[in-house]
Amino acid sequence: MFEPYVKIKKKRSVNEIYENENLEQQQHHLQQQQQQPATSDNCCCENGEPQNAPEVATATVAATSVAATSAAATVATGAAASSSSSGNCSRLQQLISTPPVLLRRSSLQQQQHQQQQHHPHTPAATATPPQQQQQQQAAPSVLQQHLGHLNYESGATAAAAATAAAAAATVATSRSGSATLAQHLATPSNILQAAFGSSNLQHILTRSAPSPSSSAISSNNCSSACAGNTHYNGGNSNSGSSSSNSNHHSNSIIASRLFGAASSSSSSSSSSASASSSSVAASSSSSSHHLHSHHSALTNSITNRINQSIRRHLNQQQHHHPLSASSSSASASPSASTSSSSSYQQSSVQQQHYNCAHPAQQQQHHHHHHSSSSSSSSSSSSSHHHHNSSSSSNSNNQQQPQQSPLCLVLLVKCPNSKEFCNAAANFCDKRLPVNECQASQTARVTSNLHASSSTMAVSRVPSPPLPEVNTPVAENWCYTQVKVVKFSYMWTINNFSFCREEMGEVLKSSTFSAGANDKLKWCLRVNPKGLDEESKDYLSLYLLLVSCNKSEVRAKFKFSILNAKREETKAMESQRAYRFVQGKDWGFKKFIRRDFLLDEANGLLPEDKLTIFCEVSVVADSVNISGQSNIVQFKVPECKLSEDLGNLFDNEKFSDVTLSVGGREFQAHKAILAARSDVFAAMFEHEMEERKLNRVAITDVDHEVLKEMLRFIYTGKAPNLEKMADDLLAAADKYALEKLKVMCEEALCVNLSVETAAETLILADLHSADQLKAQTIDFINTHATDVMETSGWQNMITTHSHLIAEAFRALATQQIPPIGPPRKRVKMS
């Protein structure tokens, strides 16, 4: 989709074109020599005044060189319509082949003044129109070189096109066009002359619109351009109407509408001019209606918005420069009185000269006043003001040649645009950034007509970005963490196929818990042939809470069977956390079918061993963590105190005490030893030998055990605890290292077995390891038959008999509820 747009660019300085003055003078003498009458037998022009033939030829060349746009053709036809022109073809071709040269405006005014003095009564004193036509060609050509729109033709093509165009223009001759142009030139526009003081706008409009692919360089297009000019000026020729309509579609729509609207709103000061103007307005109105029928209503809206925007900016510029406009009018008043005192014929010639020299101002003047209706008296009174502005503009250009005015280029590519931005109306909806909003750029550019270079474009405004998702933020917050203790237990039943198969028979596992300090004791219960008649073909499996220190416990459980590959199979999990009380069990009455379990093909009983794997998740107390959002959270680095003190122990820096054991010495620090152990603190505080000598002799601990104990004192870790748990327990108890003592108890409890149960119980009793002692007694009571057969048990009977009594006392006080239904008595008959 093409979009209409308006561009404002700065014209090159006029001084850059005034470089070849010698060539200019030679051209002037050549033009005067060519004014002599000459005849030819093969003349292609109509009979008439020969002095006007160069006007037609030159105007036709101008229209041909720019691909015959409507704006330039209108000016050329208006100049040609002042009389029924005819001339010499040879002289016409010489004028066409002459290269265009831009003349100074001051030289042009002097030539006009001299011609009016030497030939006051002959209208043939128009040697300047060919020069003005050459100026009209040269000035846009230089600007087109700056803008990149060159469209020159060869001399032969231009001559042939000029000949055909002259014939078509002669047929379409009408004096009403001259009167209409005189009316348009009579409307005041100081700001237009100040801003557009050159004749470039007309040719910029004609050269910028045609497509490069069009065949505008042919003689047929030249004829259609002339016919199009006649169509806009109210002529009667219809020979090129069809080609003119197509040419208007490919050229500037805005330029053609400006001329059509301006022709319908202008008026004249005399009665004859008013009558001709009304006829031209009627013809132009019908032509404009025929042209507008090819465009959509949206194109009209875009055109009106652009016209209103340009008028508003020109009015603002006129208010900004009231003093300069008034001074220009005052300086040009003598020339205005001279022009007003001349005859009507001389006034018409001057208006034609001004039309050729200032087409851009005429077009911009039409565009500025196309929507206003003025009376005949106002148009007549403004005619002098317009010529005064022209004279003042020329004088200003001579005095200040460095200041180049701006040239307004109107380009409309496609009238079928469906969307347009409010930039044409100078309105910004704040949906774009400042550097992207075209409406904001328009306001900045058009507020100063002397800006260096800017662009005002009408483009599509994108939709606003989606707003960011706002997440709610609370000032206070709370995080509740429910603590869940998870542990597992594996139970292996050897020779499972030999188990008693009576219904309701129960097999019970040993008790287990989540840890050494956990008061919750659990066990598994299995019914090999079901619990009742309903489940006699199944294996029933239950989780039993043996003892607890709470009223109830909530827990979830999961049962599975390990196959020969030690993989979990036939897993069943509780759907929720059940409430357990002491002596209460939960499980599955129909856990697995017996025939499926006993089938060797399934691999669930490798070597006739049933391995049950149980996972328990006990719900403990919940913990609430609360805080406030306004507190700044900093990322605190992890504490490396343990590593730092470990390095201090290894490098032995700043040590002040020596610990010797078995011929080995360890360097240590009194402060650290005293802070970690009460025994060392008492040793260094009192008047003891260790304090005086700064040396501690240890005889009942191995050096490896002492080194591990010292490492724990410095770092809080014991990497080799598993290897020396029993000896390290004794050292921790001696030097009051409670944490190390509990760590040793845990390691010994994990490795508790039938063979080591008696020795572990003796060690726990000797070093007051209460937790290890309780766990060992429970283990002995569970495996009493096996433990009694060991040598350690036999030795404990003789050396530590009180431990045997404690073990049996714990067995007696342990309350285990009856498991399973009571056995029925068998009646003896």
UniProtKB/Swiss-Prot annotation:
SMART domains given in the database record: BTB, MATH
Gene Ontology terms for molecular function: identical protein binding; protein homodimerization activity; ubiquitin protein ligase binding; ubiquitin-like ligase-substrate adaptor activity
Biochemical pathway: Protein modification; protein ubiquitination
Keyword entries, A-Z: Developmental protein, Nucleus, Segmentation polarity protein, Ubl conjugation pathway
Boundaries of every MATH domain copy: 486-616
Main location, first listed in the record: nucleus
GO-annotated biological processes: compound eye morphogenesis; eye development; negative regulation of protein import into nucleus; negative regulation of smoothened signaling pathway; positive regulation of apoptotic process; positive regulation of JNK cascade; positive regulation of protein catabolic process; proteasome-mediated ubiquitin-dependent protein catabolic process
Keyword Nucleus: yes
Low complexity biased stretches: 24-36, 122-140, 266-288, 323-353, 372-382, 389-400
Domain BTB: start-end pairs: 655-722
GO CC terms, sorted: Cul3-RING ubiquitin ligase complex; cytoplasm; nucleoplasm; nucleus
UniProt-listed SUPFAM superfamilies: POZ domain, TRAF domain-like
Residues spanning the signal sequence: none
Region (Disordered): 24-47, 106-142, 266-296, 313-400
Comp. bias regions, Basic residues: 313-322
Expression by tissue: Expressed near the anterio-posterior compartment boundary of antenna, leg and wing disks.
Localization per Swiss-Prot or TrEMBL: Nucleus
Pfam families (alphabetical): BACK_BPM_SPOP, BTB, MATH_2
Family the UniProt entry places it in: Belongs to the Tdpoz family.
Subunit field text: Interacts with ci and gft/CUL3.
Task of the protein: Involved in segment polarity. In complex with gft/CUL3, promotes ubiquitination of ci and its subsequent degradation by the proteasome, which results in hh signaling attenuation. This regulation may be important during eye formation for proper packing of ommatidia into a hexagonal array.
Domain comment quoted from the record: The MATH domain interacts with ci.
Protein name, entry field: Protein roadkill
Species this chain originates from: Drosophila melanogaster (Fruit fly)
